[in-house]
Amino acid sequence: MASSREIKRRIRSVKNVAQITRAMEMVSASKMRRAQRNVLATRPYADRMREVMANLTARVVGAARRGTLLEKRETVKSVALLVVTPDRGLCGSLVANVLRRAGRFITEQRAMGRTVDVYTFGRKGRDFFLRTGFAPAGEAIRLGDAPKLEAILGVAISAISGFQSGKYDELYIIYSEFINTLVQRPAIKQLLPVESPDISTTINVDYTYEPSEEDVLNSILPRYVETQIYQAVLESIASEHSARMVAMRNATNNAKDLVRDLTLSFNKARQAAITKEVSEIASGAAALIS
């Protein structure tokens, strides 16, 4: 059994760790609420964009789709994958789940004879692919807790341009979808070619487009894809802070349990030491009497 002094040192160390994890939990809770507000604030814009897209894509059919982001290639030979991860760890299994899903997607695509280029948002994803010898074709790191749209445009435009030039036949994004504080799950979404939103869920309004429906569509399609990427980044940030808050709360609770167990061990060790001293004194007294 460890000495009383050693156990006391461990108790002090665990209490210090618990203070740190408790502080990190409170910080993450504050950042999570802010990230949730950011996600909710962008949804009306995304919903409105989806309505306009549904109306436009229903009008533009056939040959008018060729050369646009709506065009589906007959043969898919090359795919681009955008992977969204945090810059920091200590958020449970969130990063591992996203990267595991990305790895499975890459394996599936290669099994079909397709090449895959990876673009990363966040340091964790970038470092993972660099370690595995899979250098990202583009990256964006240090996005912060409330990034602006401009922060993701460099990577987004590069990937979209790759599709427009014929370098890529499809474009996908993998990120951590925010469900609620306790649930975040890896999600994969096809970005290109753009799939027409369901027109049955939109209000049927006969808009007049200037200069033409095709020109407006060609202008709005890249913005639509950029908005989808931005929304995925915001969802991932909200998921990150939620997962970190829960992880730090669990760490704090585990530290409290460990302190309780160590305190019990300390009391037992102290009691054993006292019993030993009393026994030695009694033995010495008995020896003197005899």
UniProtKB/Swiss-Prot annotation:
Transmembrane segments: none annotated. It is found in: Cell membrane. InterPro entries: ATP_synth_F1_ATPase_gsu, ATP_synth_F1_gsu, ATP_synth_F1_gsu_CS. GO terms for cellular component: plasma membrane; proton-transporting ATP synthase complex. Pfam families: ATP-synt. Gene3D superfamilies: 3.40.1380.10, ATP synthase, gamma subunit, helix hairpin domain. It comes from the Bacteria. PROSITE patterns: ATPASE_GAMMA. Keywords: ATP synthesis, Cell membrane, CF(1), Hydrogen ion transport, Ion transport, Membrane, Transport. Belongs to the ATPase gamma chain family. PANTHER family: ATP SYNTHASE GAMMA CHAIN, ATP SYNTHASE SUBUNIT GAMMA, MITOCHONDRIAL. Produces ATP from ADP in the presence of a proton gradient across the membrane. The gamma chain is believed to be important in regulating ATPase activity and the flow of protons through the CF(0) complex. F-type ATPases have 2 components, CF(1) - the catalytic core - and CF(0) - the membrane proton channel. CF(1) has five subunits: alpha(3), beta(3), gamma(1), delta(1), epsilon(1). CF(0) has three main subunits: a, b and c. This is ATP synthase gamma chain. It comes from Chloroflexus aggregans (strain MD-66 / DSM 9485).
